[in-house]
Amino acid sequence: MAVRDEHYKMKLKLSVIAWILASSPAVFALDLQEAYARAQQNDPNWQANVLQYQADQLNLGIASGNLLPTVSLSGNVTRKNQSVNNSESEGLPAEFGELQSSSTTSRQVALTARQPLFRWDAWQGYKQVKTSVELSEVNLRLQKQQHILQVAEAYFNVLRQQSLTTAYLQEEQALSEQLRMMNAKLKEGLVARSEVSEANAQYQSAQANRISTQVQLVLAQEQLAQLIGPYQENLAVLRNDFQFQKPVPSDMQSWTELAQSQNLNILQARLQKRYSEDAKRVEQAALYPQVEAVGTYGYLKQSPATIMSSNGDFDQIGVEVNWNLFSGGRTQKSIRQAGVNVQKSEAQLDAAIRKANTDVKQSFMQVETDQAKLNARKAAMDSSEIVSQASRAQYQEGLKTMVDVLLAQRNAFSAKTDYLNAKYDYLLHVLQLQASVGQLTEKELAELNAWLIEYDSPQSL
């Protein structure tokens, strides 16, 4: 019986560890920096954001075309048929005359150049597009920051689920050993059946937890693969000497000031407000005239030629003015609508400032409390392990019941999972704090990546 139980225990351990690493048999570990580099290449959502940015950059050249000369080539061929009563030329009544028909064919080709002299609408439109290009740059920076957060969250979620799966596996193995011992003692009449039932219940619960985390691990791996593409490598894991790092600067006021000047959502809202103001000026430009210099050079030929024909080259130059004096009230209504949009953007800017202020304070306090939480979780894990070992020893001496041992053991593994969760929560809170002040870049990923090492053994999970 003991040999069979030991065989089952070893088989369970090996099968679960093999399952955890089934999708990552490669020798070299995939670290956080490499994962983000792959996400930049393989994530279609990020590629769409980059392409949208590139398309937005082209708008400036399109808008500048309204301020530059335009040259057009035109041509036409016309045929004119005319009937004339010759009685009029001879001084006779019309009824005595005869109709004479004639036809004339005209061919013309012309080259026309236009240069805006005063196009207030085009100039204001150009300024609006310049603002939109700046807004597009901030949008891409914000999307990049969110992309970094997505990749980091997906990466560390895989590590979290790997660590939890290993912890629950260890608990399941320990409880399996306890259950084996209890069954043996039950046969000898040394323990009550209720204690065996309690041990079995704890074992079934641990097994359910391990299965649940295995499912969560698969889902986490799929989420990461969705961002970076399929991968076969092990993920680099947190070093055993991982330590809490206090945020720099160390006071909340400094972080709040950084957020007010560098938070990307605030910068986005400010540019959106300027864009709305530019849009209002574009609508107001419709009240002004449009002045253009126009020059034309062409060639005209009429056949058959007559004394009245003007065959040959021709050219002309002049100034053309267009002024829309009334458009059914559309212009005034458009101006008022643009004014409302400016007020809307001002309200959105105020909301962005308030939200950034709240977010940075919340993120800073989370990182600050993570220090106390990590220390407390670590102390609880160490002390609960000591209590668990002591309970097992006291059980052997008859001072504790098996229920006491199982409770202490459950508390020890619960403290371990709490500590694991606290570590990964801290890492994500650090990234969120940096994002709240617009400073989450590849540099910050590299600093965090320094705490990762290649997968070494199941205990490293």
Residue ranges and their predicted role:
Residues 48-63, 143, 147-168, 177, ...:
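Amphipathic alpha-helical coiled-coil segments
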Residues 74-112, 239-249, 281, 294-330, ...:
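Small/polar, glycine/serine/threonine/aspartate-rich low-complexity segments that form flexible
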Residues 418-461:
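Acidic, low-complexity, intrinsically disordered peripheral segments
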Residues 28-76, 82-83, 231-274, 324-325, ...:
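Bacterial Sec-pathway N-terminal export signals of envelope proteins
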Residues 5-16:
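Bacterial N-terminal signal peptides that target proteins for export
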Residues 37-47, 54-70, 103, 110-128, ...:
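A glycine-/polar-enriched beta->alpha junction
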Residues 146-260, 366, 370, 411-413, ...:
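Periplasmic alpha-helical coiled-coil/stalk elements that build and connect Gram-negative outer-membrane
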